[in-house]
């Protein structure tokens, strides 16, 4: 392994420690980690990096692969490749197909359906004893996500991009660009496969990847890293506003008058939130907006499911 590759793996290690990606699931028990492996350069680099860091962090490592059944022989080729590579590297592998999670492939299945299928498979693993699914999202994916959301319209939360960690999932490669994951693979003699759907411009993300990012790179070769760094700052700001909003709602809930109007009394008895108006009226508009947004989040999440 050359010095540059060692630096990249050390970069992932620092990021993992900073974000506590591989913290034990519970005291005295190591995190059981599963790498989501498609066969592409990013996911094969993920597997190589996690193998390299396994002794350092002490996690048991397995892998999973989802054959969506959308690309016929090519999808089967990718599955066979991942099976062979995991066997070569000594990493236990679980392979999923739609039927394994009780799903039929719809006539016009696309990217959104494929993503929902993957996360249904991941949920099955998490329910079966896996503590954390490691996905191969990179700084390049982060930059694409930011541009995509800005183009569609987003707020501070959306500008925070892909979070390094959420319950059941971690993204160890968010500090590396796609070029760097390929460099890791080449340095380790690790082959990968190419998903032909990533080469066309049928999908909006592909158009960003093939046109917008190269154009920004011509302005500054560190454009991808800078966009990803902006996401980190936006995520920290979003978390700060969320904490302030929670404090505001707690204060407004505690400052209710002793005798509530009938409607408010019935609402509280029914388990609904009731808040004093004065603290909300005096709040900073951005904090108030965040607080109100948080109150409607469960309903919006239900609509999205």
Language-model regions, residue ranges each:
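Core alpha/beta nucleotide-donor-binding catalytic domains of modification enzymes
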Residues: 1-214
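Alpha-helix boundary/capping and short turn/kink residues
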Residues: 152, 156, 217-221, 239, ...
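AMP-forming adenylation/ATP pyrophosphatase catalytic core
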Residues: 4-42, 60-66, 98, 117, ...
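Contiguous mid-protein beta-loop-alpha structural module that forms a pocket-lining wall or clamp
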Residues: 170-258, 275, 279
């Amino acid at each position: 392994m050359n010095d540059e590759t060692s630096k990249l793996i050390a970069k992932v290690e620092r990021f993992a420690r900073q974000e506590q990606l591989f913290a034990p699931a519970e005291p005295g028990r190591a995190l059981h980690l599963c790498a989501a492996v498609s066969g592409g350069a990013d996911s094969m680099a993920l597997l190589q990096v996690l193998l390299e860091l396994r002794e350092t962090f002490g996690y048991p490592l397995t892998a999973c692969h989802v054959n969506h059944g959308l690309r016929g022989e090519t999808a089967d080729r990718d599955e066979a490749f991942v099976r062979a590579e995991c066997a070569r590297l000594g990493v236990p592998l679980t392979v999923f197909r739609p039927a394994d999670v009780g799903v039929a492939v719809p006539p016009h299945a696309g990217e959104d359906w494929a993503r929902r299928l993957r996360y249904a498979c991941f949920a099955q693993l998490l329910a079966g004893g896996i503590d954390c699914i490691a996905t191969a999202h990179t700084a390049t994916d982060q930059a694409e996500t930011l541009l995509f959301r800005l183009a569609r319209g987003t707020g501070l939360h959306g500008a925070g991009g892909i979070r390094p960690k959420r319950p059941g999932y971690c993204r160890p490669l968010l500090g590396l660009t796609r070029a760097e994951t390929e460099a890791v693979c080449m340095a380790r003699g690790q082959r990968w496969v190419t998903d032909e759907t990533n080469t066309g411009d049928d999908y909006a993300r592909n158009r960003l990847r093939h046109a917008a990012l190269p154009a920004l790179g011509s302005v500054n070769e560190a454009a991808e890293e800078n966009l990803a760094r902006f996401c980190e700052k936006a995520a920290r700001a979003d978390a700060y506003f969320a904490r302030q909003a929670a404090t505001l709602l707690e204060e407004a809930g505690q400052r209710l008058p002793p005798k509530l109007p009938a409607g408010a009394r019935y609402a509280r008895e029914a388990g609904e939130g009731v808040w004093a108006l004065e603290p909300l009226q005096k709040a900073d508009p951005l904090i108030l907006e965040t607080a109100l947004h948080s109150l409607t989040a469960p309903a919006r999440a239900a609509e999205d499911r």
